[in-house]
């Protein structure tokens, strides 16, 4: 018999899953639609497609983990699921980092030679970073993942894989997150500095005029700030999620921590949609038509 608290957590998990499924699905469809309309990929569309695709997969991985771990806690398939989870999670972080770099490149205006050099080569550097990420993380996950569910303490720990020794391996598996997170913070910091500098200039020269560039700064910073907050919640909840699966597993704790983790791929998709005017208008039209149809066909 499920408790009321556990039932509520399951309901929240289902709602988050549906929000993430619809939100990231809308972003993927919009990216492909833009490609069909223009017959070319823009860097922004590629970033949104990669980010939404990773979030879409990550949402399914969280649901699979919630569904399978009570039944197959010592299964080898969960080891593969964990390795794939780390790869998808870090790929999502890389695409979010590329988005922050894209905003920084398009909005900020600095005259420093190093900034101008990086701005001209941002696209090529991003591709090399992504390729290097896949190679390094593939080697790292193959090396560590083979031992991830085979601790050296004997047969008893093999039966219950989520023991304290695995925090070291989980830490090493997530070590690929440090570089993109640093780049993300640097580019976000540059946006803040650029906004402050631009605000000072506008205050002196253009008082009372509509400030489009400042609005672009603020919109980008809102999106990046929400992503950073949700990602930090996701990172901090991960070790507690692992700890809650130690024998005997606490199902309520598992749902609490993984529901917090699921907020990262689901809620940020809504924030991205709100920041893209055409997608936002399309979603509003679909929602309005759905409400009207429900009223027409309702009792």
Swiss-Prot record:
One Gene Ontology CC term in the entry: plasma membrane
Cytoplasmic face of the membrane: 23-45, 104-127, 197-223, 275-299
Subcellular location: Membrane
Chain positions carrying an annotated carbohydrate: 155
Swiss-Prot/TrEMBL keywords: G-protein coupled receptor, Glycoprotein, Membrane, Receptor, Sensory transduction, Taste, Transducer, Transmembrane, Transmembrane helix
Transmembrane residue ranges: 2-22, 46-66, 83-103, 128-148, 176-196, 224-244, 254-274
Coiled coil (residue ranges): none
SUPFAM superfamilies from the UniProt entry: Family A G protein-coupled receptor-like
Principal subcellular localization: membrane
Domain of life: Eukaryota
Record's bilayer topology term: Multi-pass membrane protein
One Pfam family from the record: TAS2R
Gene3D superfamilies: Rhodopsin 7-helix transmembrane proteins
Note: Most taste cells may be activated by a limited number of bitter compounds; individual taste cells can discriminate among bitter stimuli.
Function: Receptor that may play a role in the perception of bitterness and is gustducin-linked. May play a role in sensing the chemical composition of the gastrointestinal content. The activity of this receptor may stimulate alpha gustducin, mediate PLC-beta-2 activation and lead to the gating of TRPM5.
Similarity section: Belongs to the G-protein coupled receptor T2R family.
Record-given protein name: Taste receptor type 2 member 5
């Amino acid at each position: 018999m499920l408790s009321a608290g556990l039932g509520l957590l399951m309901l929240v998990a289902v709602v988050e899953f549906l929000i993430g499924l619809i939100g990231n699905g809308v972003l993927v469809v919009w990216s492909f639609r833009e490609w069909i309309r223009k017959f070319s990929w823009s860097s922004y569309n590629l970033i949104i497609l990669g980010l939404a695709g990773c979030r879409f997969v990550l949402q399914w991985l969280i649901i699979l983990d919630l569904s399978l771990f009570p039944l197959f806690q010592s299964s080898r398939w969960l080891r593969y699921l964990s390795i794939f989870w780390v790869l998808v999670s870090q790929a999502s972080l890389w695409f979010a980092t590329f988005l922050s770099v894209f905003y920084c490149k398009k909005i900020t205006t600095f005259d420093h030679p190093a900034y101008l050099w990086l701005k001209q080569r941002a696209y090529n550097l991003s591709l090399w970073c992504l390729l290097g990420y896949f190679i390094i993380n593939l080697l790292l996950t193959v090396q560590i993942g083979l031992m991830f569910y085979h601790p050296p303490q004997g047969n008893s720990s093999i039966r219950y894989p989520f023991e304290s020794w695995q925090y070291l391996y989980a830490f090493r598996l997530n070590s690929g997150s440090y570089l993109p997170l640093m780049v993300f913070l640097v580019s976000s910091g540059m946006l803040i500095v650029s906004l402050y500098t631009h605000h000072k200039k506008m205050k002196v020269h253009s008082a009372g005029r509509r400030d489009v560039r400042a609005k672009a700064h603020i919109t980008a910073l809102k999106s990046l700030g929400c992503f950073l907050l949700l990602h930090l919640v996701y990172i901090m909840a991960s070790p507690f999620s692992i700890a809650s699966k130690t024998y005997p597993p606490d199902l309520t704790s598992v749902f609490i921590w993984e529901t917090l983790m699921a907020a990262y791929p689901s809620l940020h998709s809504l924030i991205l949609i709100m920041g893209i005017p055409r997608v936002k208008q399309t979603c509003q039209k679909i929602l309005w038509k759905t409400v009207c149809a429900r009223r027409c066909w309702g009792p």
